[in-house]
């Protein structure tokens, strides 16, 4: 979990100035500005980059609020507002946002079908009647035609639809002649086609009416079925088999929901993507809902509450949870205690479709829509999902307003007819198909000093390639360190990338098992020459960043693959015994911006470390010169004193003893030195040895 940064007033002023001068996103276009701002504010690069992202989210949320729209997921719950005013507010929001929307092909119409009329549980019937009357009046009013729309399109958008929807007790709503259209300015998805799930908040003491509208000739229709449930009562149990839910009459399903409609209500906001060119679904009366043979796993879609003040806490909480969420089939939300069950079944009711448990999804077998069981997510069977222009307009993207909570642990594969747009993979971690600018949260390996020494020893022995050339060395070091081979490959790839960024040539790989005979000789030489330890320490300290395994960047992954292929060709003779294709090499990727950030921080760290080592070397050299000078003075004094003693020159001896070097003046001459004893002992031992030899 990252710690929060507290900025001074001067730093905030500098950050704001850079933001106004174009530092408005986290892409490579603003990389230089972010770097300059980090240097000027004396902050870390990642801190400034995080500030830019937070600033974007704040400005996006602020613009959405100023334009008249409420944040996604919020509902008007003030008890003093009458139901008529509440419905009127919904229409005002719809008009204000529809006028300001760009109405491009990537930002389709969103139909508001959930009308929240707060009232006490005792006055629920009266508020229902008032809301129905006000809703009928609203439908009679005309909706202003949007610019750029022809008469035919306008009429097709507002086809009269009347539908009686069975909902909770005393909460049926008749939809009149007109529809309410709301175009969301803050898009739900980023340009990376992600699918999100949202958390739900419970709002007590408010009655909920729900209408479901499906209009033809539109690629996407979003509706909000609002489900009333009793907070204290027992949860509704979903049927074990979807066939029971699909063939049962709607009356029984409505009756099954009646026990949960007497007290506090829970508002759930669900968005569905409906089909464009298929006939409308018939809901209500005695007509059974159309059975769809959906084969596929479930996918929960939910939205956050849109509370900007709570964004940081949620982001940090999700970051800490990221490595732990693996295959949860159900989880509990702390605020509302909502249990999401990971089963292949769903209730059929207002605003719901029927799902059947299976494994594959066939678009031709799903004429209307596909429902993923745990929530109401309808994927269009014939809607083309373009990668360049996605479902929602990403101009005013509020990325952090929505929090992905994928609870499906099965394999998901969605295919459309037009573009064959596919989402495949094991969706157990919510960030696998998250925002494109958000890197996948992956486990990092913390190496100890001994592990690093072992890895560097194998690296110096030729373990410098990700291909099959170094397969034996990789397996050997993985077994020695008791880690997975992929972790070792990741470390090798990171070290290769660091060498390239620092301009150092990567040593050529060598095949076969590791041979440390040359390195043992080098170690013995370095032990005999301790003066070379300073140079080796610089090389060791340069690798301090290898303690954390960092994934490869997108920009270098292709280059890594090319280098692997080149190494495969160079060492083809060595690999005849155990050939392995380069396609089997796993390369973990992160964003280019993170690799740039890491490279710059590494270069700065290396330069500062090099300066420190140079200062240290200069200090040691000065100390050595001083010691040499002292040694020369002592040598001269000793030679002069010995000559004076041999010549029995008393005056010279007195002159030398009166002018002792500073080192000798500090010595204590009161105690007898052990040196004469040692000398006499050595002389006596030598004489005894000579005597024994003569005998």
Curated annotation (Swiss-Prot):
Residues 3-63, 440-503 bind DNA. It is found in: Nucleus. Keywords: DNA-binding, Homeobox, Nucleus, Repeat. One of its GO terms (cellular component) is nucleus. The keyword Nucleus applies. One of its GO terms (molecular function) is DNA-binding transcription factor activity, RNA polymerase II-specific. It comes from the Eukaryota. PROSITE patterns: HOMEOBOX_2. Its main location: nucleus. Residues 679-695 have a biased composition (Polar residues). This is Highly divergent homeobox.
